[in-house]
Amino acid sequence: MGKRRCVPPLEPKLAAGCCGVKKPKLSGSGTHSHGNQSTTVPGSSSGPLQNHQHVDNSSGRENVSDLTLGPGNSPITRMNTASGALSPLPRPNGTANSTKNLVVTAEMCCYCFDVLYCHLYGFPQPRLPRFTNDPYPLFVTWKTGRDKRLRGCIGTFSAMNLHSGLREYTLTSALKDSRFPPLTREELPKLFCSVSLLTNFEDASDYLDWEVGVHGIRIEFINEKGIKRTATYLPEVAKEQDWDQIQTIDSLLRKGGFKAPITSEFRKSIKLTRYRSEKVTISYAEYIASRQHCFQNGTLHAPPLYNHYS
């Protein structure tokens, strides 16, 4: 069993991007065969937001590449057609958290849309929201179109106050994910925004002390050059890719830049931290409907002081 931690360990601020993958062929794993499948793993030349471990000596910030969270561990949102309000549906059985005492809310996604809209149209930033300002590790993810293609995903494993953290990572994920061009105002109507709060950090007893579909994992290891590296997958990645634990670990090692053959003994040397997440997603259409309703009825926090509903 893992050793429970209430918050992530004290460390430099971590920024993580997320990326889509194809089903993997994990070469060099030694004792584990995965068939004739292929994977796309970011290279070390992709730029600082995609590097598996990049330290900016001037700021102490460490950037760790990551994958996006998937829907399986997330409360699903729906629009109440009578009131225009957003409400989370219950989580499916077996997911990481129940709907009881959830911190994440659809209003957090609305605030992210506020921030992005104001930036893209040159308006002053929106007033502070009314949801909790407690500190959490967090991710902001943007997807686009009917097939919800990834358009940007950046987050931090350091606990940040939600008001400033969501504001910062809204713009970072939308404009500075080096895998994509910056989002534009023309793309707004097709966007989906997800906010993920990371919780329940635990030191695992070994590299298999976690559950696929329940836990996200962050590993630390020493590469073939004697350099400590880190890499992480958010809670839904392994389940969405149909990986078992060893496939996930091996993929994560490759993602972290480990190029040598992966052996059972090397896997045992990994330090693994597991965690869970709360996630909510809304579309731009839901955001607009919710903002109109809230403005008309004086509930939640008012939309930015401009008319963007025409």
UniProtKB/Swiss-Prot annotation:
Alphabetical list of Gene3D superfamilies matching this protein: Hypothetical protein ph0010, domain 1
Post-translational modification Phosphoserine, affected residues: 74
Keywords carried by this UniProt record: Phosphoprotein
Domain (AMMECR1): residue spans on this chain: 97-291
Annotated spans, Disordered: 26-92
Biased composition (Polar residues): 28-66, 74-84
InterPro entries in alphabetical order: AMMECR1, AMMECR1_dom_sf, AMMECR1_domain, AMMECR1_N
NCBIfam families documented for this protein: TIGR00296 family protein (TIGR00296)
PANTHER family: AMMECR1 HOMOLOG, AMMECR1-LIKE PROTEIN
Name of the protein in its database record: AMMECR1-like protein
Species this chain originates from: Mus musculus (Mouse)
